[in-house]
Amino acid sequence: MELYAQSVGVGAASRPLANFHPCVWGDKFIVYNPQSCQAGEREEAEELKVELKRELKEASDNYMRQLKMVDAIQRLGIDYLFVEDVDEALKNLFEMFDAFCKNNHDMHATALSFRLLRQHGYRVSCEVFEKFKDGKDGFKVPNEDGAVAVLEFFEATHLRVHGEDVLDNAFDFTRNYLESVYATLNDPTAKQVHNALNEFSFRRGLPRVEARKYISIYEQYASHHKGLLKLAKLDFNLVQALHRRELSEDSRWWKTLQVPTKLSFVRDRLVESYFWASGSYFEPNYSVARMILAKGLAVLSLMDDVYDAYGTFEELQMFTDAIERWDASCLDKLPDYMKIVYKALLDVFEEVDEELIKLGAPYRAYYGKEAMKYAARAYMEEAQWREQKHKPTTKEYMKLATKTCGYITLIILSCLGVEEGIVTKEAFDWVFSRPPFIEATLIIARLVNDITGHEFEKKREHVRTAVECYMEEHKVGKQEVVSEFYNQMESAWKDINEGFLRPVEFPIPLLYLILNSVRTLEVIYKEGDSYTHVGPAMQNIIKQLYLHPVPY
C-alpha cells in the first residue's frame, strides 16, 4: 500500500480507504479436474430428455398434467432443455385457460396457471381471482391443502402490474396467512413456505439458486416425477462442471494481476464477479457471453474501487481522461496502481474484440467500451461531489446514483456475447436510452444497495446514500425511509412485470437476461452487501453452485 501512496506523493491518510476484507477463497478455484463419469451422465441426460419431451407432448390433452409438468421443469432449472416444448405447452394452456378457470374453482390450479402464463408474457386477467374473495377483505382458503393453494396464490401475486387491486390485496392476505400457519406445516411444504416468505418468491429468485434448493424439496414429495428429478440432478452437475472449468480459467487470469499485493485496497472478488455473471445466464450456450461478462465485471469492480476507495481527485481526473481516450499511450501518465487497472481494462476488451469478431458482431465492441466510459464518468462525478462535500437532494442523488450503481454497464456487458437473434444494435441503444423497464431495474439496483450498505459507507469519507438524503430531506427516521424504499421497489417490480407482457419490443430471452441481473442483485444484497462483505450466506450459495454436486 505504502509503495503506491509514495508513487504519487500522497499519504494513505488522505485517501478514502475502505479496508475491504481479502478474498475468502484463496486458490480453491484455480485447479479444476473434470470427472471421468461425465460422458456417461451426458448420455443418460440426453436419453431422459428425449423421453420427457415425448411425455410433455402427450400431456397436451390433460390440462393439469401438462400444467404441473411445465411447473416442475421450470422450478428444477431444466426449462432451457425444453424451450420449444414448453413454449408449445404454454400456448396450449393459454388457449384453454379461460374455459378452465370458468369451470374450475381450484385456487392452486388457477394461481399456478396465471403465474406460468404471466411469466411468459401472456396477458391473462387477474379477474380470475375475484371468485376466491370472501366478501370481506380476504379470500376463501380451501379446506384441503389450504397452505399449498395459498402459497401458489402468493407466488402468483408477484406477477402483478399496476392497477391490479385484487392482487395487491391478495399479496398481503396470502403472506399473512402463510405466516400464521407456518408453525403447523410439515416438510416439504414448510420448506417451500419458508423459502417464499423469508428468501425469494419464484419470480424474484435466481433460477440456478432456486433450482438447487427445489431439487431437494421436490424429491420429498411422493408424487415427484422420477425422470424429471433424475434429469435435473444430472444436468445440474454437468452444468456445475462447466462453471468450474470457466471459473478456473478466470481465476488463472485474475492471479496474473496480483491483486492482493499490487492492489490491496480493492475488493478481491473474482469468484463473486463470476457468480454475478452466471446469475445472468447459467446455460451452457451462454459460455462465451458469461466469460466476457465475468471478466468485464471484475475489471469494473477494480475501477469502482479506484474511484471510491483510493484515488485522489487529481488522479481520478487523469484516470477518467485515459478511459475516455482508450489508448495504451495513456499508461505512462498514470500512477503505478492505476496502470495495472487500466492495462487490465484494455487487455480484457482486446479479448472481447476478438470474441465478437468470431461471433460476427464486431459492432458490439463500441457499446462495451461506451458502457465502461459511462461508468467512469459517473464515478468521476461522484468523486467531485465527495471532493466538494456536496449534499444532494434525493432526486439529484438518484439521478447520478442509478449510473454509479453500474447496472447499465452490467446489462450492456451481459449482452456482448449473446447470439445475434436475441441481442441487436437496437437493443443496446434501447438499454442506454433508459426506458421504463430499464429504469425500474435501476431503481431496484440502487435502493437495495443503499438500504443494506449505507451504514458501512458512513464509516468513511463518502457521498451520502439515498437513505441519508431522504431522512434529511423529509425529516423522518431510518425505518420510515426503508419502508418507503421498499414500496418504491415493489412499484418498480410491477413495471418490470408489465414489460414482459406481449406484445414486447425485444425477445423474451433478452428481458429474462435483464431480469436475472436484477435477481442476482437481490441475492447479493439479501444479507447486506455480500459482494463487499462475503459472509457465510453468500459463501454457502457459492459452494452449493460450484463446489458441491447434487447427490444422486
Swiss-Prot record:
Pathway: Secondary metabolite biosynthesis; terpenoid biosynthesis
pH dependence of activity: Optimum pH is 7.0-7.5.
Residues annotated to bind Mg(2+) 1: 304, 308
Subcellular location: Cytoplasm
Single Gene Ontology MF annotation: terpene synthase activity
Enzyme Commission designation: 4.2.3.70, 4.2.3.87, 4.2.3.93
Highest taxon above the source species: Eukaryota
Residues noted as binding Mg(2+) 2 in the record, renumbered to the chain: 304, 308
Names of required cofactors: Mg(2+); Mn(2+)
Temperature dependence: Optimum temperature is 40 degrees Celsius.
EC supergroup of this enzyme: lyase
Protein's GO biological process: diterpenoid biosynthetic process
GO cellular component terms, semicolon-separated: cytoplasm
Pfam families for this protein: Terpene_synth, Terpene_synth_C
UniProt motif (DDXXD motif) ranges: 304-308
Catalytic activity entry: (2E,6E)-farnesyl diphosphate + H2O = patchoulol + diphosphate; (2E,6E)-farnesyl diphosphate = alpha-guaiene + diphosphate; (2E,6E)-farnesyl diphosphate = delta-guaiene + diphosphate
Residues at which Mg(2+) 3 binds: 457
Family (UniProt): Belongs to the terpene synthase family.
Entry note about domains: The Asp-Asp-Xaa-Xaa-Asp/Glu (DDXXD/E) motif is important for the catalytic activity, presumably through binding to Mg(2+).
Protein function: Involved in the biosynthesis of patchoulol. Also produces at least 13 additional sesquiterpene products, including alpha- and beta-patchoulene, alpha-bulnesene, seychellene, pogostol and alpha-guiaene.
Matches recorded under PANTHER family: (-)-GERMACRENE D SYNTHASE-LIKE ISOFORM X2 (PTHR31225:SF251), OS04G0344100 PROTEIN-RELATED (PTHR31225)
Protein name in UniProt: Patchoulol synthase
Lineage: Eukaryota, Viridiplantae, Streptophyta, Embryophyta, Tracheophyta
